[in-house]
Amino acid sequence: MSKIIGIDLGTTNSCVAVMDGGQVKIIENAEGARTTPSIVAYMEDGEILVGAPAKRQAVTNPKNTLYAVKRLIGRKFDEKAVQKDIHLMPYTITKADNGDAWVEVRGSKLAPPQVSAEVLRKMKKTAEDYLGEPVTEAVITVPAYFNDSQRQATKDAGRIAGLEVKRIINEPTAAALAFGLDKTEKGDRKIAVYDLGGGTFDVSIIEIADVDGEKQFEVLSTNGDTFLGGEDFDQRIIDYIIGEFKKEQGVDLSKDVLALQRLKEAAEKAKIELSSSQQTEINLPYITADASGPKHLNLKITRAKLESLVEELIERTIEPCRVAIKDAGVKVSDIDDVILVGGMTRMPKVQEKVKEFFGREPRKDVNPDEAVAAGAAIQGSVLSGDRKDVLLLDVTPLSLGIETLGGVMTKMIQKNTTIPTRFSQTFSTADDNQPAVTIKVFQGEREIAAGNKALGEFNLEGIPPAPRGLPQIEVTFDIDANGILHVSAKDKGTGKENKITIKANSGLSEDEIQRMVKDAEANAEEDHRLAELALARNQADALVHATRKSLTEYGDKLEAAEKESIEKALKDVEESLKAGDKAEIDAKVEALTQASQKLGEKMYADAQAQQAAQQASHQQAADNAKPVDDNVVDADFKEVKRDN
């Protein structure tokens, strides 16, 4: 049975792991790195670059290089958070027909799950290269505070990438798994996982218990902000640089897409450097130009300056910590360990804030970039039956309910309820002889339904005429282990029932997913075609080079017609390389091989003649070295001692 891999699909970076021989193995990608930038670039010739190659060309291709797409997954175009990002991204965020936030590259509209699927395909290929076998199943992580639409969209991305998503698991829970299984301490421990990544923030309070030799991980509460992360920290630095440059040079860089891409790269680098040094210098020559000529950017940023720029962002992470502690029904002093996850937790100021709130030093023995993927791989081994000593009890992050009379949100499942779970409640009609009811499903904590996230709606029709309040409509909410919701409504009188898996009143339809799966498969074929073309080109180039070299050395030994034939074949190969058709390249290479046979014969004959000449000269030298007179007699001699 093939292994179930664990994938941390991050906003900024992604990581893949697998359980191998009882140990978690973080798998290096083709570039030799343990994490892969979650960046996808769409090239002019139709090629799709993922990871480091996409990041390297971002400066020259900003409009078609997509990053931080996870911030859009499962979101509506009109949401405040999306509107805020539209003006910050160099690429185009557009409104889909169903109201979702999509992206546009090279004239095509793409759904965020489609883009994320490219990253997942890279992760899948990385695992396959390591394991040496096909991989079809995965556990994929999401921020704990992701709502139903975002979870569903992540699952869709997995399907488009050719993966059966066995489980969607919360990132802090995955990190706790990786941490908890490592430790030998006995007894119950309560841990706080503070996860500040590239685009999202989560905090979870988790209890790790030893139950008859089995480690039980129970999530007590979770909270967070799905639009707060390293990208926002980068943006603060970018805004500061733009402001300083405008003051100094009078030029507004925010209007220059190419400059913005360079600033983004520089801001990220500066942020990372300031975690280990007190000051860094941003030096970007030829950042822009005006009538007076080219402009260069040179700016020093201190750690203190960075901290003042992002202070409010760090402060925003503390309130969710407070709420999570309260919801878990514990005190801060009850927390035994604080685990930091996500690249942003390397920032000293973040660590300081966390220590200040929890009153203890955070653990330093967890790799913030790899713990989540490691936990996902552990969960994969549990699902495949390889591990039987782990039990994971996760929760739903937000309350779920339906809209009832007066627009009120009637909660069916409270936030932080352990999943999977099921809950039923009976409702009735609001009007006399009402023939149908519309069940509108919401997720959130507000008392009024409209203030929460609308997940979807469906109708239950065919209710027999009756006075209001008489029909009995049983509504059932069922959350599976992935945190995905299924809702049904049943008329107890007639037995009529209608049910839906909440796909949000947006999301991708089954047809769209199937189309994207086919597109992805076609892309895989295209990738294979491009790889074969590259190989054919390399072989043709090598043959052209070798033939030209031989022609220079041995051309004068050929007849004019033979030489002409080879030169024509060489020219044909070079022309076919420009056209880029593999079949044509192969045909012209074959023709060149045939044409240069005579050249090969001459080279072979020449080499044989040289070899024969060398052997003859060696023989001559050996003969010359022999003594002239073979009739040599050894002479007797006698030693005569002289008297002194």
UniProtKB/Swiss-Prot annotation:
Disulfide bond sites: none
Induction of its expression: By stress conditions e.g. heat shock.
InterPro entries for the chain: ATPase_NBD (IPR043129), Chaperone_DnaK (IPR012725), Heat_shock_70_CS (IPR018181), HSP70_C_sf (IPR029048), HSP70_peptide-bd_sf (IPR029047), Hsp_70_fam (IPR013126)
Residue list for modification Phosphothreonine: 200
Biased composition regions of type Basic and acidic residues, renumbered to the chain: 635-644
Stretches the record annotates as Disordered: 609-644
One matching Pfam family: HSP70
Biased composition (Low complexity): 609-625
Molecular function in Gene Ontology: ATP binding; ATP-dependent protein folding chaperone; unfolded protein binding
CDD domains: ASKHA_NBD_HSP70_DnaK-like
Keywords: ATP-binding, Chaperone, Nucleotide-binding, Phosphoprotein, Stress response
Entry similarity comment: Belongs to the heat shock protein 70 family.
Role this protein plays: Acts as a chaperone.
Protein name, as recorded: Chaperone protein DnaK
